[in-house]
Each structure stands twice: as C-alpha cells, then as structure tokens.
Curated annotation (Swiss-Prot):
Enzyme class (EC, first level): lyase
Key words, A-Z: Cytoplasm, Heme biosynthesis, Iron, Lyase, Metal-binding, Porphyrin biosynthesis
One GO CC annotation: cytoplasm
Function of the molecule: Catalyzes the ferrous insertion into protoporphyrin IX.
GO molecular function terms listed in the Swiss-Prot or TrEMBL record: ferrochelatase activity; metal ion binding
Enzyme Commission number, as recorded: 4.98.1.1
Name of the protein in its database record: Ferrochelatase
Alphabetical list of InterPro entries matching this protein: Ferrochelatase (IPR001015), Ferrochelatase_AS (IPR019772), Ferrochelatase_C (IPR033644), Ferrochelatase_N (IPR033659)
Native source organism of the sequence: Teredinibacter turnerae (strain ATCC 39867 / T7901)
Pathway involvement of the protein, from the record: Porphyrin-containing compound metabolism; protoheme biosynthesis; protoheme from protoporphyrin-IX: step 1/1
Compartment(s) of residence: Cytoplasm
Amino acid sequence: MQYKSQNFSHSQNPKTGVLLVNLGTPAAPTAKALKPYLKQFLSDPRVVEFPRLLWWLILNGIILNVRPRKSAAAYAKVWTERGSPLAIHTADQASALNVRLQRRFDDQVVVAWAMRYGSPSMADVQQSLFDQGVQQLLVIPLYPQYSAATTGSTFDALSADFQRRRWLPALRFVNQYHDNPGYIAALAERVRQHWQNNGRADKLILSYHGVPLRYLHAGDPYHCQCLATSRLLAEALQLTESEVITSFQSRFGREEWLQPYTDVLLKQLPGAGVKSVQIMCPGFSSDCLETIEEIGEENREYFLQNGGENYQYIPALNAGEDHIDVLEQLVLDNLQGWSLAPTAKRELEQRQQRADSCPFNQTKKL
C-alpha cells in the first residue's frame, strides 16, 4: 500500500485540532447532485445493514433512478442563498467554537468541520488540519445519541483515512453526549423560550431520527439513549410522563423501525383529543431537511388535516450561544491531559538543528 506522506518539519509548532462532523448534504438541490450523494450515503453498510449484492441491485437498479428527483424537490424547499441549512449551521458552529477556543489557546487549537457524506469530506479536512501542524486530534460527531449508523460510521471513515496515512496523530473521539448536563440544559432553555413566546401546547413531542428495530435487538444503544435524553429533558422542564411523547421519524423501507412513528402519531393525536402540539428534535444538532421540511411542513399537514388546530416546531440548537457553550465544554473536558501550550521558538530551532546535524538524515528536510 502507498501511504500518504506527511509534510512534517521539526521547526513547525505542533497544534491540536478539533473536528466537528455531521452527516452530510448534497452540493446542490438537483437530481444530478443528489445521485452521487445518495449513492455514497446509502452504500454505507453501517446505514443499510442488508446483504451487499442484493442491496447493490436495489440501490442501483431502483432507488438511484427514482429517489434523486424526489429528494431534490424536498431540498429545493429548504435551500438558501448560503446553501444547505445543515452545512450553514455546522459551519457557523465551527466558526463560533473557534472564536471561543482562540480566546483560550490563541492559535494552538484549530477548529474545522466536515461531513461524513458529501463535501467537505472528512479526509480532505483532516489533511488540511495535518498540513497546519495538528498532531493531536479531537473528533466530535454532532450526534448526541450514539448509533452505529451515524457515530459508528463516522469512526469508520476516520479509520479508513488513517489506514492510508504513514503518520497518525494522537486521537480522541466523543461517541455520545446524550445525557450531558449542558446539552440537556440548553434543550430545556430552548423549550422555555418557546413557551414564553408562544404559550404551552397540549403535548410536547420529542422526535428522533428512526432506525430499524433490529438494530436495537442487535445491541445498538441509540433507542435507550434517546429515551434517556427525553426523560432528562422532561425532568428539567418539570413535565410529567403524560405531557411528553417520544417518537421516531424518517423511516425508510418496509421493515419495522423504532416506534411510535412520528407521522403516524401526529395523524392519531387529534382523534384522541390532542388539538395542539409542540415538537422538538433533540437528536439533531442543526436544523436540516428532516427538521425543516419533514417535521416543520410535512408532519404539520398530517396533524392539521386530521383535526389538529395548533402545531409548532421548536428549532434545533444550531449555532446558538447555549449550544456553543455545550460544544466548548465538551472540547475542554476531552482535551484534558494534552499539552496545549506552544513550543518555545528556541526549542523549535534546536530541534531543527539536531535534525539537520543527524548523520542519518539524508534529505535534511526533517
């Protein structure tokens, strides 16, 4: 195997990198852009655990000939002048976090963001970080609840890139923060602010992205962590079990997924006497297609068409100050024990001199 070379210099000041990773987005709201994005996403065996040959036939023979056009129409509804909402919010989160960390560590800590699927790719962003002298890397997948299909897949991509590199950084990886006190407090404050401006509804629905039920039976902790987040958030808001409902959205295919399904639930609630609902998606660190269009529009119609009277979506934390507080504390907690002080200029010069004088140094470049 040909390993990637590292542009290393003894005179370069070693830095620490913080990499925020989210799921991904197409380059444009068009069928042409959606096809390669969906192919990369749905080809991931972590996302679709199905016999590979059979799935390849289904994906390439049916799905990629039908779904890109349909998905493009949905993306077009949420696209902005700056691009995809998910990319915008993730970039803003990284920028705000970088400002916070610059105040603490000057330029010793570098913050970047990447997407698991699409652009900017993890491999490209990691290369950029290493080119800047990053020798310690903290990776934070922006999924509060762990699932093999999201956080696990992020680690797969990280590992695949590392397998091609000659030199590897010191590595730390945040695999979940579903019960992080700051995260729960930020969610609770977002709900309280909404209540202050809009009053309370009959029910607060906490909708998470669904996964097939068999993932739970195979040991994936996602379902348990979603329920834990809901319980802690309800406690923070002093709500009873009857006032909060946890549900799961965005199911794909015909097999059974985690229930109750959000869309089915919203069709049924008006018949049970629930005329007003407020819905939040705690598993989404940023608003995106699944929250803006699916929850904000599509599921609103289901509720109102079946007799509901008042439907309100509570936005994600996005790049709000309280969310940046959470991310900053996650970083500080996970950087403990690593050296973050800049290396003295004199020490760097001495390192370079020793390297230059080493008899085994043929190139004199290290």
